Structures are given as structure tokens and as C-alpha cells.
């Protein structure tokens, strides 16, 4: 994933990354909002937790964590 831009807004650093192809929301929508399998959910959650650990160690805050913003290549 490439960083495209960054800027400061109200004394907060904002970072813009490239848009990847599929989001968790897209997967849920394709599955008629019936959820995801346990195996897929585990994979996604493990990756989110790993990413959040990295974010915490870097002393950053993600202010908009939602299915639409969890993206896959």
C-alpha cells in the first residue's frame, strides 16, 4: 500500500493511502449481509489486530475504523 499524500487538519496529521480493490463492507454486501465464515472472519480480525498494534506502537490514532475502510488488495 502506498501513501499518496498527507496534510495537517486542526493540528492532526492526516495520511491518504491508495484505494485498494475490495473492502470488508463489499464482502458483506456480496454475501447479502449474512456475515462471513468463521475462517474468513478470523483472518480479517487477526490482520486488523496486527495493524492496530503497529498503529499503537507508532503512537497514531485511526479515527474512522469501519468495514468500508478495511481494504484488501
Where in the sequence are the language-model features?
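Short beta-strand micro-motifs within the conserved protein kinase catalytic domain, predominantly
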Residues: 2-13
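Conserved alphaE helix
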Residues: 11-14, 19-73
Amino acid at each position: 500500500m502506498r501513501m499518496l499524500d498527507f496534510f495537517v487538519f486542526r493540528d492532526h496529521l492526516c495520511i491518504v493511502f491508495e484505494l485498494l480493490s475490495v473492502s470488508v463492507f463489499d464482502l458483506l454486501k456480496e454475501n447479502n449481509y449474512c456475515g462471513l465464515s468463521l475462517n474468513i472472519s478470523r483472518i480479517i480480525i487477526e490482520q486488523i489486530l496486527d495493524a492496530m498494534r503497529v498503529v499503537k506502537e507508532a503512537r497514531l490514532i485511526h479515527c474512522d475504523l469501519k468495514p468500508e475502510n478495511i481494504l484488501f488488495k
